[in-house]
């Protein structure tokens, strides 16, 4: 799995460029915080919530 695939599966592929430009890798995903997501330009609360829920799943593995 790569970050672009993960974002596409979440229906949030519009953020692929932001994650790529900020060198966010699969290894970094579990460490992202709500503030990190805001810094990446994810301003919609629902999108941040969806990402944080998916990040929580990654933390379990």
Q: Where is each model-derived feature located?
A:
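Sterile Alpha Motif
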Residues: 1-21, 26-61
């Amino acid at each position: 799995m790569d970050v672009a695939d993960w974002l596409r599966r979440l229906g949030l592929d519009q953020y692929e460029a932001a994650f790529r430009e900020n060198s966010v890798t699969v290894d970094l995903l579990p460490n992202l915080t709500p503030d990190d997501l805001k810094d990446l330009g994810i301003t919609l609360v629902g999108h941040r919530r969806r990402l944080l829920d998916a990040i929580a799943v990654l933390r379990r593995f």
